[in-house]
């Protein structure tokens, strides 16, 4: 969300946008309490030294020209582990639908610290993250694992097998 939008849009529109972004990022079916979202909007609209806050399982982080929103790792880590199928999409973390093109015994879980370390060792993620997205945000990204082996991180375009496809789509649209 750009500061330009924050400065141009009416408070009511911004509150609705923030509610929806937080719902999408958290996987919640209900919006956060309006008073809490109003507090976030007030914080975003003011000059202060606080760089990040959380609400409803979402980290809201101020950057130079925009604000980013991403799932808190602790909420993501408690999500039920899903074993994707080839026949239909399964929901993971109330945020993503996942399906495979081949039957494999894989589990979907957040990338976490271990996965981020692997991605850094392969030079896919840098010390600061990737594409202006911090490492802390990548930790909550969906990934596929075979026991302790990282097989795929769809959002990073990483997969150990060329003939293996993962179909990933958002549960909710912003």
For the regions a language model picked out, list residue spans one by one.
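AMP-forming adenylation/ATP pyrophosphatase catalytic core
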Residues: 1-174
